[in-house]
């Protein structure tokens, strides 16, 4: 009887804990760059593109909106500046979405008012605080977490002071330790950027890129 009671209590505890957790996903044109002060784990987000939230916590995600857009008869890749989005957790599943960007007018409108929508699966709009994360220097994305930590310490609109000093990556299931120092060499900016992003990618992505590059010859 004691064993049965203990098992029942454990099951109730797990059920209670799960009831207060929601899962965040995004529209196809959004990439997660950082979650609660930590760099998003590309390997995990590549397959699930989701993370957990708790209704008792304030959460913060840094996102980038990316779209292939038309410029006359040509197409090009548009990538927004990183957007910091802060919101209160919920026990419902949540979708973070951005408007579809198809042409130059859409891009201009989004640049004039860059924002995303955070909505529960039941259709409730979740209040957010949003702001562009300003970055400086060559390859600013390489210092995203440091820049975010400084932002969170600044008391800005969407800052969360608890994330000003990033926690160790092992504390979060979707985070990973920063890679070692990345060294790039090249005769121009484009070559250096290619080297940098190649070293940031996982092995599968690197292999696909190499195959693609061979086919361009």
Curated annotation (Swiss-Prot):
Listed transmembrane segments: none
- The signal peptide stretch is 1-21
| Pfam families in the record | DUF2057
Which keywords does the record carry?
Answer: Signal
Report the sequence similarity comment from the record. Answer: Belongs to the UPF0319 family.
Tell me what this protein is called.
UPF0319 protein HSM_0266
